[in-house]
């Protein structure tokens, strides 16, 4: 695969045209386009291991053929740190039976700030020999090492990496736990955060955030409003978000572990939730809602919930479901801002953002 600028520009223009066509029925403005580095943009990578000629190799499989491995020596789309670590880790397992025995998968997680973690997955219990070898590996490579085996986990160092991103002239620190979702393209993520920060603007009222994850958007957006009520269902993400709020001294956010559907019931006073004890929903003066839903988009009830708000800031990883949600809201809201974020260069996937404002 070649990574030349001309091919990249052609692919990016195709994505812009696709987004433009999907949003054309809603009189959307021309999208702002945020491009990606051509290489070394991906901060995480996962490889299976494949034995050939008595040696284990990094391997991946194409979506069309799950049986034939593609052996990998380097991975140009991954961060420079991952590419530096790959041969050193391979040399380490080749020289160490405790590290290599029944090792079947390796995961790397890195950050723009230079932090790194390696997860090693095994088809066997981990013993003291593994622990000693993994501790030496962590020291040699200056990384945290996680060992996984049948639901058990051994941690050498930390079970998270720390990312630092600049938004609106302020640097935010993010704890990103092993196994939790993080944005894979750090450079584009930072551009996306700054776009959302500018799109929301300085406000005197409150923000509702659905699907807040580890607080990726929550931290900078909280500095633009009076108060934030944020929801997330993943316990790992909730704990990371709480840690990130504390670490960054952001004290105007209340985080509740509810699904978007449950929050809709709570706001409609359908039934009480124990997890909302101590939260006075009537004290909020919501002017805006921020949503970053999964690929399926918002379900119809959640979409109706967002209609209550004058401003809907929507980040989408699936432009088709974004368009379907906008179609539901189009009679009351219009697109005033639109953006394409090329989180996934060299694929057909794209991230997009819109600001919908009440007519």
UniProtKB/Swiss-Prot annotation:
<keyword id="KW-0949">S-adenosyl-L-methionine</keyword>
<feature type="active site" description="Nucleophile">
    <location>
        <position position="317"/>
    </location>
</feature>
<dbReference type="InterPro" id="IPR011869">
    <property type="entry name" value="TrmA_MeTrfase"/>
</dbReference>
<dbReference type="InterPro" id="IPR029063">
    <property type="entry name" value="SAM-dependent_MTases_sf"/>
</dbReference>
<dbReference type="GO" id="GO:0030697">
    <property type="term" value="F:tRNA (uracil(54)-C5)-methyltransferase activity, S-adenosyl methionine-dependent"/>
</dbReference>
<feature type="binding site">
    <location>
        <position position="216"/>
    </location>
    <ligand>
        <name>S-adenosyl-L-methionine</name>
    </ligand>
</feature>
<feature type="active site" description="Proton acceptor">
    <location>
        <position position="351"/>
    </location>
</feature>
<dbReference type="GO" id="GO:0030488">
    <property type="term" value="P:tRNA methylation"/>
</dbReference>
<feature type="binding site">
    <location>
        <position position="211"/>
    </location>
    <ligand>
        <name>S-adenosyl-L-methionine</name>
    </ligand>
</feature>
<dbReference type="GO" id="GO:0000049">
    <property type="term" value="F:tRNA binding"/>
</dbReference>
<keyword id="KW-0819">tRNA processing</keyword>
<dbReference type="GO" id="GO:0005829">
    <property type="term" value="C:cytosol"/>
</dbReference>
<keyword id="KW-0808">Transferase</keyword>
<feature type="binding site">
    <location>
        <position position="292"/>
    </location>
    <ligand>
        <name>S-adenosyl-L-methionine</name>
    </ligand>
</feature>
<keyword id="KW-0489">Methyltransferase</keyword>
<dbReference type="InterPro" id="IPR010280">
    <property type="entry name" value="U5_MeTrfase_fam"/>
</dbReference>
<dbReference type="GO" id="GO:0019843">
    <property type="term" value="F:rRNA binding"/>
</dbReference>
<dbReference type="Pfam" id="PF05958">
    <property type="entry name" value="tRNA_U5-meth_tr"/>
</dbReference>
<comment type="function">
    <text>Dual-specificity methyltransferase that catalyzes the formation of 5-methyluridine at position 54 (m5U54) in all tRNAs, and that of position 341 (m5U341) in tmRNA (transfer-mRNA).</text>
</comment>
<feature type="binding site">
    <location>
        <position position="232"/>
    </location>
    <ligand>
        <name>S-adenosyl-L-methionine</name>
    </ligand>
</feature>
<comment type="similarity">
    <text>Belongs to the class I-like SAM-binding methyltransferase superfamily. RNA M5U methyltransferase family. TrmA subfamily.</text>
</comment>
<protein>
    <recommendedName>
        <fullName>tRNA/tmRNA (uracil-C(5))-methyltransferase</fullName>
        <ecNumber>2.1.1.-</ecNumber>
        <ecNumber>2.1.1.35</ecNumber>
    </recommendedName>
</protein>
<feature type="binding site">
    <location>
        <position position="183"/>
    </location>
    <ligand>
        <name>S-adenosyl-L-methionine</name>
    </ligand>
</feature>
<dbReference type="InterPro" id="IPR030390">
    <property type="entry name" value="MeTrfase_TrmA_AS"/>
</dbReference>
<dbReference type="InterPro" id="IPR030391">
    <property type="entry name" value="MeTrfase_TrmA_CS"/>
</dbReference>
């Amino acid at each position: 695969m070649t990574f030349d600028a001309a091919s990249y520009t052609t692919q990016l223009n195709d994505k812009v045209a696709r987004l433009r066509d999907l949003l054309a029925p809603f009189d959307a403005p021309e999208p702002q386009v945020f491009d990606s580095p051509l290489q070394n943009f991906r901060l995480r990578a996962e490889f299976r291991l494949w034995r050939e000629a008595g040696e284990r190799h990094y391997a991946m499989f194409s979506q069309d053929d799950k049986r034939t491995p593609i052996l990998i020596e380097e991975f140009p789309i991954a961060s420079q740190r991952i590419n530096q670590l790959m041969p050193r880790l391979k040399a380490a397992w080749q020289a160490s039976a405790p590290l290599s025995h029944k090792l079947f998968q390796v995961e790397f997680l890195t950050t723009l700030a230079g932090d790194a973690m390696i997860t090693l997955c095994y088809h066997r219990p981990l013993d003291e020999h593994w622990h000693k070898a993994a501790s030496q590996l962590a020291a040699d490579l200056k990384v945290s090492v996680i060992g996984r085996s049948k639901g058990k986990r051994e941690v050498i160092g930390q079970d998270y990496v720390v990312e630092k991103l600049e938004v609106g002239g302020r640097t935010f620190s993010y704890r990103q736990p092993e196994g939790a979702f993080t944005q894979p393209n750090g450079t584009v993520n930072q551009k996306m955060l700054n776009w959302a920060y500018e799109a929301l603007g300085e406000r005197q009222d409150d923000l509702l955030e659905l699907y807040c994850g580890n607080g990726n958007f929550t931290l900078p957006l909280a500095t633009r409003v009076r108060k934030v009520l944020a929801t997330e269902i993943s316990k790992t993400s909730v704990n990371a978000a709480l840690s990130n709020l504390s670490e960054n001294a952001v004290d105007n956010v209340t985080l509740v572990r509810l699904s978007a559907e449950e929050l809709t019931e709570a706001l409609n006073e359908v039934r009480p939730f124990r997890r909302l004890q101590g939260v006075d929903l009537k004290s909020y003066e919501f002017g805006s809602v921020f949503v970053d839903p999964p690929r399926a988009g918002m379900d119809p009830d959640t979409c109706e919930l967002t209609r209550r708000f004058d401003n809907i800031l929507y980040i989408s990883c699936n432009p088709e479901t974004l368009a379907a949600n906008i179609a539901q809201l189009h009679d009351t809201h219009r697109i005033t801002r639109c953006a394409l974020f090329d989180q996934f260069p060299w694929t057909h996937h794209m991230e997009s953002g819109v600001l919908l404002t009440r007519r």
